[in-house]
Amino acid sequence: MSSIPISVEGFKQLEKELDRLKKERPGVIQAIKEAREEGDLSENAGYDAARERQGMLEARIKYIESRMAQFNVIDLDTISGDKVMFGATVKIEDLESGEEKEYTLLGPDEADYAKGSISVQSPVARAMLGKEEGDEIVVDAPRGKIHYEIVSIRFLGTKGQQR
């Protein structure tokens, strides 16, 4: 089983979610019990909804617990360097269009494209890993190969200060 990188902050967020889900569990069980007491389960929408919620809740708890055993927790405040790696914020330029994009490389369980972070397992991140400023990378995309240049590499850590 390989380890999955995650930041300390990302790990804490999942711990909070797991705790919240476990606290929600008794309420869902109670809702099932109450719906069951209403009688005929074949036409009991409340029962069906509560059972569905229980299934989703238990699946998410199981998923988080199994992932936590695989995590390699990395403190973003302790990493720096001149090569792209987990935790780096990387600016790249599309060599054809000139468009610039900036991504922070995080683990798959905390990446959020809308917030500018991508998984280190994504095709773009995999092409960048180990590269330096000025290096050219090629990403296989649905529209074909895209050539980028790495413009800058920064390590901001959790305090937002560049190292």
UniProtKB/Swiss-Prot annotation:
Gene3D superfamilies: Transcription elongation factor, GreA/GreB, C-terminal domain (3.10.50.30), Transcription elongation factor, GreA/GreB, N-terminal domain (1.10.287.180)
Coiled-coil regions listed in the entry: 11-38
Highest taxon in the source lineage: Bacteria
Keyword field contains Metal-binding: no
Family matches, as InterPro entries: GreA/GreB_C_sf (IPR036953), TF_GreA/GreB_CS (IPR018151), Tscrpt_elong_fac_GreA (IPR006359), Tscrpt_elong_fac_GreA/B (IPR028624), Tscrpt_elong_fac_GreA/B_C (IPR001437), Tscrpt_elong_fac_GreA/B_fam (IPR023459), Tscrpt_elong_fac_GreA/B_N (IPR022691), Tscrpt_elong_fac_GreA/B_N_sf (IPR036805)
GO terms of biological process kind: DNA-templated transcription elongation; regulation of DNA-templated transcription elongation
Pfam family, one: GreA_GreB_N
Keyword Coiled coil listed: yes
GO molecular function, one term: DNA binding
Record key words, sorted: Coiled coil, DNA-binding, Transcription, Transcription regulation
UniProt record similarity statement: Belongs to the GreA/GreB family.
Function: Necessary for efficient RNA polymerase transcription elongation past template-encoded arresting sites. The arresting sites in DNA have the property of trapping a certain fraction of elongating RNA polymerases that pass through, resulting in locked ternary complexes. Cleavage of the nascent transcript by cleavage factors such as GreA or GreB allows the resumption of elongation from the new 3'terminus. GreA releases sequences of 2 to 3 nucleotides.
Protein name listed in UniProt: Transcription elongation factor GreA
Organism: Nitratidesulfovibrio vulgaris (strain ATCC 29579 / DSM 644 / CCUG 34227 / NCIMB 8303 / VKM B-1760 / Hildenborough)
Gene: greA
